[in-house]
Amino acid sequence: MKSAAAFATFLTLSVFVATTEVQGTPGLRGLRSLADNQSTESSEGRKDHYNHHRHVKKVIKKVKKIAIPVPVAVPQYIPVPISGPSSVIASQNTAVVGSSNNVVAASGAGAVGSGVLGPGGVTPAPTTMTGRPVATPAPTTSVPSSLVNTDTSDNQLPTTPVAASQGGGIGSNLAGGSGNSVSMSGFGGGNQMGTFGNSMFGGRGANTGNGFNGNGNNSFGQQMGIDTPNGNMFGGFGRQGAAGGGGQRGFGGEAPDGINSVASGNALGGGITRRRRRL
């Protein structure tokens, strides 16, 4: 009996001592705190992971709610009304405006009959500031009035310009006189290569046959002078002379030795009359 009581007392004391040593040992206390910390860290990690997943889900939901802008088609050609004269032809419908009416009638697919409006059919013609329609100008012609009346004259016909001549005397113009055409003579004098007229050998100018007393083979008047038998081809006062016709050389004189025979009126030189003129 005594031995059993002693054994129980010994066992109780040994258990008490062992418990006290475990609590007082720092190593054992560290193991216990480490186990507690691990459990705490694992729980916190799980919480962080859970919170992260919840945040990602919220961001995804927000992105899905963002509206994406869609480009809107804009027409490239915007129709603009243009005001112009009544004879304007439209580029799309080839609309033509007549002079008798003031309405543009389209000849395309949108054209309709008179008095009926259709899509693109009738467009009002441009008007003035007071509301009146713009008048269509009447057709004009550049033909002279004499051609229209079948009565044509030389003065109303167009003339062809004559090219400038390279040779000749001191003439007032280069090729021809006051008229249009070119004379076949000319060595100097009043004009360079022509007459005072407008035809081949003079014309309707100052004389009929020749120049104005200054060309090589020309003179002042016609080929018919005052004195018929006295003129010759080198000058004189006669048929081919100066006052009436001046001859084919100078202004006056006679024969080869006249005052202007091959003389001062032209470019060949002058002399003094040695012969008496025959009457």
From Swiss-Prot:
One Gene Ontology CC term in the entry: membrane
Keyword Membrane tagged: yes
Main location class: secreted
Keywords on record: Glycoprotein, Host cell membrane, Host membrane, Membrane, Secreted, Signal, Virulence
Composition bias, Polar residues: 147-163
Function, in words: Secreted effector that completely suppresses the host cell death induced by cell death-inducing proteins.
Family: Belongs to the RxLR effector family.
Annotated protein name in UniProt: Secreted RxLR effector protein 90
Organism this protein belongs to: Plasmopara viticola (Downy mildew of grapevine)
Record gene name: RXLR90
